[in-house]
């Protein structure tokens, strides 16, 4: 059972990295601070951390731990979001003028990559695929629309 669970987690991490890579390609083509590898690694890490939640919960359900610890899988998701928020904040730069801020879209795409990884980590593949497509549409199509407007 443990090997099957490990393989399942590994496959989810691979899928999350693939979906994160979809976002990363768009960022990479635009020469942004966080590109293909960063998005893939963040999505994969999110899926791994959430996927390991099952193993952690199972481990601590053993008789010797039951009275000592309670496992809350939501805390793993909170940890992913906090870590990614820290990394994403590093992509945001403020210019010399008060209205000059860059990197917000890249930071947002990193957070979405983590969310996609979380979705894959809990085997919500349809949601992960759908959100990946929506993100690419927002990143690619809306950029063209923004350029036409301004």
How would you label these PLM feature ranges?
Residues 75-92:
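Hydrophobic, membrane-facing alpha-helical anchors
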Residues 21-33, 87-99, 141-147:
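C-terminal ends of transmembrane helices
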Residues 1-76, 128-130, 144:
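Alpha-helical transmembrane segments and their membrane-interface boundaries
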Residues 129-137:
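Alpha-helical transmembrane segments of multi-pass small-molecule/ion transporters
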Residues 71-79, 100-103:
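Internal alpha-helical transmembrane segments of multi-pass membrane proteins
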Residues 41-51, 105-119:
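Small-residue-rich segments of transmembrane alpha-helices in multi-pass membrane proteins
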Residues 119-129:
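Transmembrane helix interruption/hinge and helix-loop junction motifs
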Residues 14-17, 84, 108, 132-133:
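Residue-level signal for the membrane-embedded core of alpha-helical transmembrane segments
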């Amino acid at each position: 059972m443990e090997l099957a669970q490990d393989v399942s987690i590994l496959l989810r991490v691979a899928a999350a990295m693939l979906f994160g890579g979809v976002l990363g390609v768009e960022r990479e083509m635009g020469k942004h601070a966080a590109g293909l590898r960063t998005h893939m690694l963040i999505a994969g890490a999110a899926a791994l951390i959430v996927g390991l939640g099952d193993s952690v919960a199972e481990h601590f359900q053993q008789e010797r731990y039951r009275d000592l610890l309670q496992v809350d899988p939501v805390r793993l998701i909170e940890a992913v979001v906090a870590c990614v928020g820290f990394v994403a904040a590093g992509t945001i730069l403020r210019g010399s003028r008060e209205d000059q801020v860059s990197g917000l879209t890249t930071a947002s795409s990193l957070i979405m990559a983590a969310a996609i990884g979380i979705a894959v980590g809990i085997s919500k593949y349809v949601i992960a695929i759908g959100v990946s497509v929506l993100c690419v549409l927002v990143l690619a199509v809306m950029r063209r629309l923004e350029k036409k407007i301004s």
